[in-house]
Amino acid sequence: MTFDKLPIGSTVGIIGGGQLGKMMAQSAQRMGFKVIVLDPDEACPCQHVAHDFINAPYDDTEALKQLGERADVVTYEFENISAEQLKDLAASYNVPQGYEAITLLQDRLVEKQTLEAAGASIVPYLELKDAQSLNQAVEEIGYPFM
């Protein structure tokens, strides 16, 4: 997969307007990009720094399409968005991060298994299905655990 350099003055669309979105927007602006943000909270931190703002829920298909149409590239600030909707967005618009990582990040067990398979050092974990598996985790991992 190859990506062309985004020309200065292009518009970056960000799904999510929290603190991370705000920092992303400010960095993009310092590099000469315009920023449009989609967030359900009209008082979100990013709303005050973005060039344009779409006030809509993250799962609003029409709002996501509007963001895709108005931005040269679309990114997201967190994993709490629908991987399926992100997949649909990436099929028609420039979403270089894709949706695959979101799919992994939304299931913490799959996330840990994927990192472990890739050779990353991670803390011990067990899948908790019921009270018995919780007791097993206490015995095998010990306290504290999350």
Model region roles, listed by residue range:
Residues 104-146:
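Active-site nucleotide/adenylate-binding loops and adjacent lid/helix of ATP-dependent enzymes
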Residues 1-106, 110, 132:
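ATP-binding N-terminal substructure of ATP-dependent carboxylate-amine bond-forming enzymes
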